[in-house]
Structures are given as structure tokens and as C-alpha cells.
Amino acid sequence: MSDTTHGRVAVITGASSGIGAATARALAADGHRVALLARRVDRIEALAGELGDGAIAIEADVTDREALVAAAQRVQQELGGTDVLVNNAGVMLLGPFSSEQRADYRQMVEVNLLGAITTTEVFLDQIRANGGGDLINISSVAGRTARPINGVYAATKWGINGWSESLRQELQPDVRVTVIEPGAVGTELTDHITHAATKEATEEYVKDLAIRPEDIADVIAFAVSRPRRMTLNEILVRPTAQPS
């Protein structure tokens, strides 16, 4: 725990599993109070119970602005506003480019890109009102390179990277913007791939390669604990054995 993190309030989207849940644990251990946002309310309620009095669970879908506004009101009332926002909610619906995948494409754009933008728009005033803070956007190694079957997913992450750099310039010095670009991580992302052959191949690829969600959470905790005079703008974290 450090003076820069003790008592601060962190809002984490997609907090029901994977990187989101691991980040909640890491930030709580560093002295943050945490607001856990996700659709699977049973999971975040269990996690809030595990973390104790400084944690609240709020059912919210990042594609639903009204739900986000209600969540922000609860954070303000119960925790005193937001100091750190972690835009973690996302889906990775890989597959060959085809009209059969158009619902997946729309969902990725709405969750990965527009969801992060809307969440930030809703919570940014609280961060400013609290004297500034940290905005953490979870991107991907796919935000640096595109490959077959990940085109639209990569497009959403390239979008996150470009938008984040614009925000960094616009919001400094009061709000620090950090982009985290994970490589293969052992999460539930592959569970939701609808293209059967792609799902099987992706799961096989990450099975023995993936790093743990806690590895990314540790990086996030490190970034937000840095002295205010500095910002870690972009952090690429890959398994040591990941080729690209």
C-alpha cells in the first residue's frame, strides 16, 4: 500500500472474471476502494464480499448508458466519486471475415470501443471533481498488429489506442491515461468465440502459452501507484514465449 493509492476509488468494468476480477483484488490490496461493474451480478457480489467493506458490486452493461449513469451515481453516493477508471470490459469474437459473423462484429465495436468511450464519458466528471486521477484502457497486442481472423477485434483495439492517445493529450496533466496491451492471457474470452474452428484453434494456441490475469493486474496496480509527475502511457505485456 502506498500514499498514492490508499483510500482512492477505482471503478472496474468487466469485473466478474479474468483481468477485471484480478485487478479488483490487486487494487484493493493496495488500499483502493473498488466499484465492481459487470453484467453477472452474482459473481461481482461474491467478489465484493471477498474484498470486504471497501468494495461494492453494481450490475451494469457498458453498452447501456443509463445503467452506467446509475452506476456512477452509486459510486458517488457510496464511495465519494471516482479516482481510477479501468475500462476492461471486452469481447474477442474471432473468426473469418464473413456476413455470418456480422452480429459478432457489431458486438465487438459496441462493447470494446463504444463501451469504453461511453463509460469514460459518464465517469470523467467524477475523476476531474476529485482532483484528477487515472484512466486505464485495456487494449491488446492486436491493437498493434492485425492478423487473419482477428480483423474487427483488432480494429476495436486500434481504435482504443488512437482514442487513448488523443485523450492523453487532452486531459493532461490532471488525468493520466495508460493503455495496457496484453498478449495471450488465460481468461474466459475464448469461451464466447462463435466460429467453432477458430475457437478450437485459439484455445489450443493459448493453452500452454497464456500468462495469468494476475500478471496484468500487477502491471495496472504498478501504473496507478506511480508518482503523479509521471505516466506510463503504453504497456505491452506478452507471454515470454509468444512469438508475436
Give short role names for the model-derived ranges.
Residues 96-97, 101-106:
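Substrate-binding pocket helix/loop in short-chain dehydrogenase/reductase
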